[in-house]
Amino acid sequence: RDVAPSRGLGDVYKRQVLGYIPAGSTNDFASTLGIPKNMIKAAAKISDGKVMSYDIGVMNGRYFNYVAAFGLFTDVSYKTPQNVKNVLGHQAYVFESLKSLSNIKSYYLTIHCNEIEMKGSYIYGMISNSRSVGGVKDICGKDVELDDGLFEVTLVKEPVSPLELQQIVAGLLSKNQKSPMVERFKTDRIVIESDKAVEWTVDGENGDAHQRVEISVVDKAIDIMV
């Protein structure tokens, strides 16, 4: 998981230069920043690397490091037993994700973003600032900039046929990133509302259930050695 940096964000927001040593199973945060997954090599980066600034997010007053998401697969990280993750690593997430396919749940949402209102049924949503999520590189596109004051938004519509489900998979994993079932855009602020509380995950941890979520970007908030 990649939760350690986000847990301390509120305390270090006084502006300090951070070092990060990855110790999780997937390590999206380290992968995005180009930090070695080897702990000794990562420690060396802290001493002889360079300082980089990157954006963080705020969801209903809670700081997060690189991703806030709801829907399909998002409970995998914190529901997968730690001993299983220790043994299988990234494969543990894959196995748990496959279980979710048998219980696809949709959410009817009203989304306010970039002076536009959208309404529809979605099975997955992700607001992120990362080149890797769940161990999948470039899932948010190839033009991700970590310090541009914008986060990438990915919304997956509810499929009503096997063909649409196939289009979703292709849209998320293919390099052209285009699918009628997957909406993508950038923003510095988004509000998502629903009639019922929706479970969220934040940096791989339980983010609680919310009927209304407001997410905004804190531009170049953190300095880190890379």
Task: Annotate each PLM feature.
Residues 74-76, 119-121, 133-136, 161-164:
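Short acidic/glycine-rich loop or secondary-structure boundary segments that cap or lie
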Residues 2-9, 13:
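Single conserved hydrophobic/aromatic residue that forms the stacking wall/gate
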Residues 14-127:
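Catalytic core of DAGKc-family lipid kinases
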Residues 105-107, 121-123, 147-152, 186-188:
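A generic structural signal for short beta-strands and their flanking turns/coil linkers
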Residues 84-91, 141-160:
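Gly/Ser/Thr-rich active-site loops/lids in small-molecule metabolic enzymes
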Residues 69, 73, 126-142, 206:
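Glycine-rich phosphate/pyrophosphate-binding beta-alpha loops
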Residues 113, 119, 145, 155-226:
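ATP/nucleoside-binding phosphotransfer catalytic cores, i.e., glycine-rich phosphate-binding loops
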